[in-house]
Structure formats: C-alpha cells, structure tokens
C-alpha cells in the first residue's frame, strides 16, 4: 500500500459500454470509469473512496469505489462505482434535518411536515384533482419520502397518479401503483405535487413526509496541478473531502465528506461492523497515523446507515453507506465538502480527454503494497451498455 494519498484521472465509461464488460453490472445503481487499455484504476483498499468530476469550477461526487476486475486495472476491466446520481435521493433522505412546516394546497390535507391523500388510510375519492405547492427555502433541497403509497396501477399511470414537478414545470416523476419507501429529491424554489384520480377503481392513497437537505459550499479544492494503479501521489490537501477509515486500528477504506457530520463510503466496507470500532480521519495525506501534515481531524463514528437494498438485485448493487461522525467537521484548510452529483452536469462518457478523478490509499497493483501517501488517477467514464456484458 502507498503511504500517501494517491490520485488517478479516469475517463467515464457509458452505460452501453459498461454493460458489455460485466455480467454483474447493475445499471440502476452503478457507473464505470477506466481506460480500455487498462493500467489505471482502483485496487484493494480504495473501496469507499470518491470518483469526482469537475463541472463549472466545482467538483461533484459521481461514484463511490465499489469493485473491479481481477487483477486490478486489467485491459477492458474498468472500475465499477456506486452511482451517486442514482442514489442521491436515498442519501438525502437519510441525512435531512429541518422539516417543511408549511404547504399551500387546495385540498386541505396537510398537517405540518406530512401530506396525506384525502380519506387516507381509507380509499381516496374518485374524480379528484388536488395541487400541493411546497416552497423550498434558498440553499436547500426538498426530500419527499413516500411513507406509504398505494394508487391504482397502470404502466403509464393513466388512471390515478401523483405527479411531481418543479417551479419551471419540469416533471420530476409520475407515480402510481405501489411506491412505498421511495424518496424524491427536488432542487428548485418550489415543488408542485398534482394528485389526479379517475372515476373508477381506487386504493388507500399516500402518506408523504417532507424535509430539507441543506446545501453547503462544496466541491472547492485548491488550484494545483498534480498508485491507485497507474496513478500519482496527490498534492497535499488537494482533495479536501477525502476520508480515511480505520477499523480496530487498521486501514479499512476511503470515504467522502458530503456534510459536516456525514461521510459516504461503500456498504461492503462497513457491513456487519460496529460504529464503535471505526475511526475516521479527515485532512490526511499519509496512510500512517504516525505521519501528519497538520490539517488532520479525527472522529469516532456514532451511526452506520447501510443501504437497505445492498446486494439487490446483483452483488454490490446499492453499495453505499453513511457514517455519522461524533461531531461536525470544521471546514477549513485541508477539509471540505464534495458536492453530490447534479443532473445539470452532462457526464463526459467515453471522452478521449480524461475528466474524472479517483483517489485513495489502495494497493499500487494487484496483491501489491499500499502507498505511503494519498494517490490520484484520472479515468474516463464507461457507458453502462459496454460495462454490463
């Protein structure tokens, strides 16, 4: 293993391309990055670490290092990451804080931070048309959680449906049938929920809860020019959201600071572990705890939230977990937040110019040693279709 944090710049691989490369690739929760010729990528010990891409001067967390072909960085075997964009609603739902206290509606069914369909839990009326407007304060995103959701089902939701749009009337989703447990994220100044029923069959309706996901300044790193396999030693403090996880004193995995109290890592890193034996270091550069750069912050873990559908439907599907730190991190030199993936960012799949980076203290080659410092590598994204076969 390296003794310093390593970095590598990787091209993203499109869904189409990734599906061709791996039978266990799950396009609903995974994303690929790496080069066709191999030689660069993540390896043992990099699990849980970040795959970040730059967009308009900010860095966005696109993936959480999950798994790869054997040996590491083989030709046509890109690294596979949990897809943060597809899992963002789940992440936000787990770490939200401030409840929404007012909702404007013409159906008079809102009480504080919950919304129930008319008549709930009994059958909702026929021929209903209700519009609910949820104002979203500045610098927050709204998470709508479906505590219970049962509407008449149809493949296109033609009969009874709940449609969620933003303030620009952009459709975020249209829902019917059984959707209990779903979370929906709205990033705008208002969310509009339209509930429409027809004149025939009905069901018990829905019970929704609303909460805010407060955005902080994120994705800012120092202006620096730079073995994860084939990578380089990362400049000190150049990836301020990089977390180092230790279990019972031994290096375990990487992670990313997404809120002052929350680190996102891979579910397989912490599966079956107790929070009390996991320690998190932020602002670190060296693998060894004996070598410091002066920006380190040390934390206990008080809670682990593993994705409920980890390993479903395929091995390593939904491979994410949240670690709640014992106190908020102090955001200063060497420690900062990474932005969660944003749909505004057009992912640069299959670009010849490398555009995304992964970092960690994983082994420099298959069954090799770990570096002393944090490593980095630039990788291309691989399309889902090419990664799935």
From Swiss-Prot:
Limits of the Peptidase S1 domain: 1-96, 228-389
GO cellular component terms given for this protein: extracellular region
Entry-linked SUPFAM superfamilies: Spermadhesin, CUB domain, Trypsin-like serine proteases
CDD domains reported in the protein's UniProt record: CUB, Tryp_SPc
Compartments where found: Secreted
One function term, GO molecular function aspect: serine-type endopeptidase activity
Tissues expressing the protein: Component of the acid-insoluble organic matrix of the aragonitic skeleton (at protein level).
PROSITE patterns: CUB, TRYPSIN_DOM, TRYPSIN_HIS, TRYPSIN_SER
GO BP: any one term: proteolysis
Keyword entries, A-Z: Disulfide bond, Repeat, Secreted
Domain CUB: 103-213
SS bonds (residue pairs): 18-32, 43-72, 157-176, 253-269
Family from the record: Belongs to the peptidase S1 family.
Name this protein carries in UniProt: CUB and peptidase domain-containing protein 2
Organism: Acropora millepora (Staghorn coral)
